[in-house]
Amino acid sequence: MENFSLLSISGPPISSSALSAFPDIMFSRATSLPDIAKTAVPTEASSPAQALPPQYQSIIVRQGIQNTALSPDCSLGDTQHGEKLRRNCTIYRPWFSPYSYFVCADKESQLEAYDFPEVQQDEGKWDNCLSEDMAENICSSSSSPENTCPREATKKSRHGLDSITSQDILMASRWHPAQQNGYKCVACCRMYPTLDFLKSHIKRGFREGFSCKVYYRKLKALWSKEQKARLGDRLSSGSCQAFNSPAEHLRQIGGEAYLCL
């Protein structure tokens, strides 16, 4: 992605590379950057965002960055790589920041500036690894050799464990105090007004740096294991009860039979 380097205008001394690129900075040591924007922005561009390359324009419009100060000659005092940096490097300042930032990008980052495929690929890899681990745990839990765990069954189990439904979210929040203003994410403790917002946060929170989807999947896998354990206990105790009912019937008839000792 983009490489950001901070250019300080007030405070610590400015590096020699920045001074060689912007010689007017020494004469305008101000706390804000409007003066630098006047000297750096070319007069041909009607707005700062128009001077950016197309990939940076989409990033600025998407992130809401305004009052952008640019410099077409971002050579940074390097004669060997000056042409490369002049093509791939720009400078801008967000409206909420007292600093200006160098943005240097290569061809790979230009291709990734629109859809962020790395994040989607990492998310897909993480999801696939997690579902495969769950499927392996399910297959290893069956001890009988006749249970071969076919692929269709594992695909169904993966789909059931991967999908987080509204019932799963409400079940996870059952042990927490009831919220009156909305729905609370059990993983990150953030509040959302509706259940749909919470579901979209769990589904797409990986792009924002949250791992709530992984937490809910682990929780759902634990629930499935507990449910299987309880079902096994009921079957083991139900074998005795199944034999008790005909024994009681025989006792009523007059015979004595103890089928479950």
From Swiss-Prot:
Signal peptide: none annotated. Keywords: Differentiation, Membrane, Nucleus, Spermatogenesis. Testis-specific. Its main location: nucleus. InterPro entries: Spt46-like. GO terms for cellular component: nuclear membrane. It comes from the Eukaryota. Pfam families: Spt46. Residues 140-159 are annotated as: Disordered. GO terms for biological process: cell differentiation; fertilization; fusion of sperm to egg plasma membrane involved in single fertilization; spermatogenesis. It is found in: Nucleus membrane. PANTHER family: PROTEIN FAM170B-RELATED, SPERMATOGENESIS-ASSOCIATED PROTEIN 46. Plays a role in spermiogenesis and fertilization. This is Spermatogenesis-associated protein 46. It comes from Homo sapiens (Human). The gene is SPATA46.
